[in-house]
Amino acid sequence: MHVGYIIAACAVVGLLAETQADARDIRLARDGKSEYTIVLSKDASPSEKHAARELQKFLLEISGAELPIATEGDKLPKRMIVLGDGKALRSLKVCIDFRDLGDEGFAIKSAWPHLVIAGGRLRGTMYGVYAFLEEVLGCRWYSSRVSRIPKKRAITLKPLDIVRKPDFEYREPGYTDAFDADWAARNRANSSYARLDEARGGKIGYFPFVHTFNGLVPPWKYAKDHPEYYSFINGKRKTEGTQLCMTNPEVVRIAMETVLRWIKERPDAKIYSVSHNDWYENCQCEKCKAVDEEEGSPCGLLLRFVNAIAAEVEKKHPDKLVDTLAYQWTEKPPRITKPRANVRVRLCAIFQCQYHPYEQCEKNKAFVERLREWSGITDNLYVWHYNTNFPNYLFPMPDLDELAADIPMYKRFAVKGIYAEGNYSSTGGFMDELKAYAIAKLLWNTKADAGAIRDDFLNGYFGKAGKPIGRFLDLLHGKVRAENIHGDIWDTVDAQFLSPEVMAESERLFDEAEKLADDPDVLERVKHTRLSLEYVKIIREVNKVGASGTPEEKAATLNRLEAFVRECEADGMMQLKEGCSIRARFEEFAQPLRK
């Protein structure tokens, strides 16, 4: 059972609770006063100290009561909120299996008149504090700028006995806003890209993140004198746009030395990526081809290469991990070689239909089978999932159904970590804040109600305007569901589901949302979300007028395009397309209008 399912049973907060309180209830605060002290152990970790400050801050904001923070001593306070393991916890004789909780699990337990929140020293106790604030007291952190902290005259708690662990060891919502340190910590995302410091428990850090062959054996350094280090293609060695010749023992040696140097230079990282470049061109020399044929997949040679490096890493740095990819030409698992225990393989779900749950979509059957095969040869599988439209970050991509079904699916296939790649390079993609929030919640607890998460976000983020925006999302998802329309991460503004009827109804719903927005900040968020519709309309106009418009029509469309881009810039957007500045993208669109 998860915290979200037992809120009503665990906490009754307010005057009614105060008047009907049982003798064993914990009366945490009333009328701006509290008898409780937040107690830390003498050797509290940085994240536990940060958790104490966060608990103090939000309890003050909720109730008006500022609880003191103390380090346990010979004499303990009469009423305590005990954070973490130590003398204070042991004095209460509360049973918590810290070994089972690991680094990130936690327990929230009543020990009347005391409250205990304790877990793994690295992040567990801190996560327990945020779970208490969120799921018991009603706090929400929807985005880095939008939160909901309730105001309560009294806080009275029914007995609590909660134990939680995350469903995935690595949880990364890949959106720019999700990299905010406080947002990531409060939503229990241990993201590599997040700006998480030691006080916030650190993170599952990668270095480098991906596509590292050129860094492992740099062509600029070796290609001139040693072309044999690189792919043999069509009868000759290729030293640009290439991969490595992984059967060459010198390549293995150099790559191994590079990884060991990376570990020395970046000891803060947990995982070091040994992954092929972002293209094909794998080596076709006789030795490499022989291994490929033996293994039934080029990934066999890749894993032999990665395993050799990982074996040396394990000898010198047993706490570090090595990562690689099952992507493009390495997606198919090998017949013979299996990843070592300290290797994480990221299976990339890049060529799938993103509009339907994978197990329910005929276009995704092959990937589901591939997932099944990989989970059969490693207990440490990661997945690289995709949650945006890369050439069109503002494209209204209807993938919430898919996310709600497939994150739990990954758990069923024993996946250990997920990087959900969204608009990682700029703010302002389609429903980025909602997607990041929902992904974070599902990565922690795959049994969470995705629909309830969505509705809670829409209500908290948009207020009264959230209902028509919810109907807009229902409209998009209902269209692709009812008509079995497929789409991927490169879909265009001419996508079939964006029919004239859908566009017209979407406009009506956003008109309604703008009228219901009763706060300037909410209205700004509604208008920002509406930019996705404006994007579809203006780019459709650009394509049509650019192809057959008169000079006057082209000039007018160019002016409207310029105005749209300026609005995006004013909203803080830096990119409309992956790897392309917003002004460079404007020039791409503007080119046919200037002919």
Where are the model-predicted features located?
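Well-ordered, non-membrane alpha-helical segments in soluble/globular domains
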Residues: 256-258, 296-311, 361-372, 398-407, ...
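Structured mid-domain segments that build the active-site/substrate or prosthetic-cofactor binding neighborhood
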Residues: 250-253, 261, 365-467, 471
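Acidic, His- and aromatic-enriched active-site or binding-groove loops in soluble protein domains
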Residues: 292-309, 340-360, 438-448
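Acidic, contiguous N-terminal accessory segments
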Residues: 6-12, 17-107, 147, 153-161
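Substrate-binding cleft/loops of secretory-pathway carbohydrate-active enzymes
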Residues: 323-351, 394-401, 427-436
